[in-house]
Amino acid sequence: MAVLSKRSMKPSGFQRTREVKLGDVVEFEYELPEPLKNSKDIANWNLPINKQKWTIPSEILTQLQYEELDIEEATDYLVQIMDWRINGYWFYNHGNIEYLTGDHFFYLAFWRIDGVIPYWKDSDATFFYIERYCQLKKDCYGWMQVTNRRDGKTGKATSIIYNRITLNYNANGGIQSKTLKDGKVIFGKLVKSWQKLPPYLQPEDSGDTNPSQILKFVEPAKRSSKGGKKVYKEVLNSQIDYLSAVDNAYDGSKLKYYYDDEYGKTTEVDVLERWNIVRECLVQGRNIVGKSLHTTTAEEMEDKGGQAAKNLWDESDIHEAVKLGRDMTISGLLRWFKPATHGLEGFIDSYGYSIVEDPKKPILGIDGAMIEIGSKSYISKERLGKSGSTLAGEKRKYPLTIDEAFIEEGKLSPFDIIKLNEQLSHCGTLSNKTVKGNFVWIDRESKQVGWQPTETGRWSVLWMPPVDERNKLVADRRGYKPI
């Protein structure tokens, strides 16, 4: 009789509360559901630890298998699938208990990206955990992400918008990208993934097998015979479309879900101004009725688009919102920066965990290759010997901090762009409030001067050096001069 391995995590050991950090600072915390109390209800419980990993559940049926079920069996099956799509799924992964949100389960079990089956990895789990948290949080319109290139953000986003819209009646999903052409590409990817779904996951639609602008979940148009009575099917009356990048494209619409693709590369409009219009499509009175996801890669942020993206990022600072006494951020969004070290292709073990630090011995990767160094060492080595705009470009491609993600490449600058950006980052940490006051003598003999704040002061000071760095001077033939 199979038993749970002694080395496997017990449900009581599952960490429900997780932190989202920006550097060393906690941005916010989220809580995951309580795991199933009986270990035997968690998938893979009966497997040896080295065999425990994510695989599509054997309960998932092909369309042919589904059609062989009787009505009662088919109903029970769809109810189970619906439960997993909404409430999620639990499985053992190399001894650890892992939770898939409903959106994550749908993505892994059913969504195909260019015909490829996605695999589970820890950085994607965090992505979907944040998505779930924002879905449940009342005073939140959604969230924004900055990540490295080739992170699979488009596949995850299109999967989420499809899952959300097809679980609701009279729900509209909208997509915008940096241009109309790019929006069409994103929509085209969604359509291709939709076409690969088994028909039992394709709600009644308008009949267009390859829609180019809008995917409508409505009854196909048909003519009734003269004098005949039309009979209508029960349909979702929901839809997913994409529109041009202009700021008022969705003005006046009601959206259940909105996807903003590559907001950091959008130059046709100011993405912050566009978001201020779109967010009204997600609210009814004072109630938030829709959510949004905003993603961009750090590499190749356009000058104008990068600055607008930075403004949107800054307005999504929860700590600043708390200081102001607000219930939500100024933008209404939360934010997450994923360092390039996490989820980096080539540095993910066979169970889906990121190999950030150098392993003691080579580890088998999920791609079948051996991993001999961690992603942190790899990225550091790629930067060796590079400087100026070349190094800046490398940092933007694989950023380790949010400052590196927003670094200005400075291709036309004659100065060291890295040093300039370091100074910009430092200046950004300073208060922008000056203090009025006067410089007064503490001791004329030793030439010691102090600072006395007063509203009627003659001088305005933005920053003062540490006390032990003040009043440093040397005497020369002309008197005294500062060091």
Each language-model region and where it sits:
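N-terminal accessory segments
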Residues: 1-141, 189-193, 200, 210, ...
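RNase H-like, metal-dependent nuclease domains and their acidic two-metal-ion catalytic environment used
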Residues: 2-8, 12-16, 30, 142, ...
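Walker A/P-loop
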Residues: 138-161
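Post-Walker A helix-loop "phosphate-sensing" segment adjacent to the P-loop in P-loop NTPases
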Residues: 164-171
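Conserved Walker A/P-loop ATP-binding site and its immediately adjacent core
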Residues: 171-193
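Conserved nucleotide-binding/hydrolysis micro-motifs of P-loop NTPases
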Residues: 180-182, 298-302, 342-345
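Structural recognition of the conserved hydrophobic beta-strand(s) that form the central parallel beta-sheet
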Residues: 241-242, 288-297
